[in-house]
Amino acid sequence: FPDYEVTEKIFNDYENSFIKVRFGRGPHAILILAYEDDGVYEWIGADSVKIYTLNGRIVKTAGLNSNIEILRPSDNIFLTGDVYEALNLYNPDLFSSNIRRSMNAPEASSIKKLGQKIQVNRIQENFDLALIGWSGVNLYYQNTTTGLIEYSEQRIHPRLPVIKIEYYFKY
């Protein structure tokens, strides 16, 4: 499926903050910000899919073929060094398994969004769920001015392709 760019006009057509989500090479979807609770954002799609993010990181999903839930996600996703978190995977089910993750030091980079070049920190997260031999790399692009995540590529479940998310905030 071809990708499409969110233009200033498309951005202005939405009343609320939203994310543009793409699973692997599939079509994109727009999810609207429905709620914010203690820093966790709940994004809802037209098909009732829900993605919950904390500082741009997916911490829970609902309505997908395979879902995840990080039981007590770390507030500061950018801590360097190893962090262990309890994780539930659904379809197939795996409960309270420990996932190890570590962040690399940020690298200066830039991305293009709404027709503008944005300076970002590119942050690489390595993860490993040893019990099932699943590991990988997630990427976060953090705006150097606002501190917000502008874009991410996340692997959240061994049965799902990489999820690419563009974040569009309205205040």
Q: What function would you assign to each model-found segment?
A:
Residues G63, N67-R72, G115:
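Acidic/charged, solvent-exposed loop-and-adjacent secondary-structure segments enriched in E/D, K/R, S/T
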